[in-house]
């Protein structure tokens, strides 16, 4: 799947046709693309709401256009950085998962992974869950989603 996204981005960057992005507020950061099982794309990104609050938004590209962006979550506790940023993942059918990092303590690298799921194509989202329970405050991140052998959502970090 990652090869498909890379090839798609390469082909789009080498072609003349314009490929519009979803409507995002100025200053939006850290977009991430994921393919869907029916050949579409999902994109998630951070939008700054004010001086301390951010929202995690998403949009879907299908039938040659992007859907109106919707908010997955908003918080002032996000751990926002250039190296490890939120993702969105198409589990299958109308099921989607997303993740972000959230501060868990006062230390520079005290953060946890938060995961949400939607079973109605992003109309509503579950409460955020932390997929690890090792009891440490720091450096949980770089999560990757996958479908396991039963086609259920899997995660590794």
Predicted regions and their residues:
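Sec-dependent N-terminal signal peptides
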Residues: 3-13
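Generic cytosolic/nucleocytoplasmic N-terminal low-complexity/intrinsically disordered segments
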Residues: 1-2, 64
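Extracellular, repeat-based ectodomains that mediate carbohydrate processing or recognition
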Residues: 14-157
